[in-house]
């Protein structure tokens, strides 16, 4: 029984390490996925990409996703957007 509990806890820790929070990446343009006030669209897109909750961050006009894989998130250091939409 202790082994089963240990395996479950270990799995949860590994899953937590491989996920992150951030702005969704539009892989075609390299930009953030933009939005205005549509939380439903951002939430759906976030869940499709493996996250558990997404919303439209109004001040940045971009979809913010919690729990998605890092490869699905926009990163400032690897930004390839250059203003193209």
From Swiss-Prot:
GO molecular function: sodium channel inhibitor activity; toxin activity
UniProt domain LCN-type CS-alpha/beta: residue ranges: 20-82
Record-linked InterPro entries: LCN-type_CS_alpha_beta_dom, Scorpion_toxin-like, Scorpion_toxin-like_sf, Scorpion_toxinL, Scorpion_toxinL/defensin
Signal sequence, start to end: 1-19
Swiss-Prot/TrEMBL keywords: Disulfide bond, Ion channel impairing toxin, Neurotoxin, Secreted, Signal, Toxin, Voltage-gated sodium channel impairing toxin
GO biological process: defense response
Recorded GO CC terms: extracellular region
Annotated disulfide bonds: 31-81, 35-56, 42-63, 46-65
Source taxon at top rank: Eukaryota
Similarity section: Belongs to the long (4 C-C) scorpion toxin superfamily. Sodium channel inhibitor family.
Function: Beta toxins bind voltage-independently at site-4 of sodium channels (Nav) and shift the voltage of activation toward more negative potentials thereby affecting sodium channel activation and promoting spontaneous and repetitive firing. It binds to distinct receptor sites of mammal and insect voltage-gated sodium channels. It displays antinociceptive effect in rat models, which is due to its specific modulation of sodium channels of sensory neurons.
Domains: entry comment: Has the structural arrangement of an alpha-helix connected to antiparallel beta-sheets by disulfide bonds (CS-alpha/beta).
Protein name per its UniProtKB record: Beta-toxin BmKAS
The organism of origin for this protein: Olivierus martensii (Manchurian scorpion)
């Amino acid at each position: 029984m202790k082994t089963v509990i240990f395996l479950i806890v270990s799995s949860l820790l590994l899953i937590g390490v491989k996920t992150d929070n951030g702005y969704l990446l539009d892989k075609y343009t390299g930009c953030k996925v933009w939005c205005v006030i549509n939380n439903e669209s951002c939430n759906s897109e976030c869940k499709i990409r493996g996250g558990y909750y997404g919303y439209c961050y109004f001040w940045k006009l971009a979809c913010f996703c919690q729990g998605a894989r890092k490869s699905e998130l926009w990163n400032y250091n690897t930004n390839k957007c250059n203003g193209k939409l």
